[in-house]
Amino acid sequence: MGKNTIRRYRFGNPTDTDAVVLKLPAETGEIPRLKAEPVIDPETGSEKGIRFSFGMDPEDILFGLGETVRGQNKRGHRYTAWNTDEVCHTEDKQSLYASHNLLLIFGPGKLFGIFLDDPGRVTWDLGYTRQDQAVIVSENGDLDLYILEGESLTEIAREFRRLTGRSYLPPRWAFGYIQSRWGYASE
């Protein structure tokens, strides 16, 4: 598989979410491509989470985060991974029904993925506050962070599937009659 790698880094005391099927030992030391630092509560002086950041070049494109609104390139916006049931899905909404904490970074000399196995609130500031910087904040700081590297976006996606397992696709007939409780206008 060439240069494909998955590295795991553990912070705090994470909850086992069963999101990962490939059990890897946690590495220690510096995280490649990311800077990690604690988030300090200004009132108490105690740690209240962890912040990861990396610099971005103008050409960098950011993909991922699953069920979030806006276009394919997530750059220039802020997203919150915290499941909410929003009736009106407009572009100013930061989170939806599901949290998918996978971000793919593609740019000149840059190609990697970040996956946070964190059931808590995670904020992704992807060049919203500063155009040249991405900042990811885990509110509780208890998580497993995975760095995925490969020679192409397809290879990184393949590594992610190896990490989290293959999705089950039921046969078409298994869906039966599907009905929504919402009303939809004829379009």
What are these regions (language model features)?
Residues 185-187:
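Short, acidic/polar
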Residues 1-172, 180-182:
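Catalytic and substrate-binding clefts that recognize carbohydrates or anionic sugar/phosphate headgroups
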Residues 177:
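Conserved, well-structured core segments
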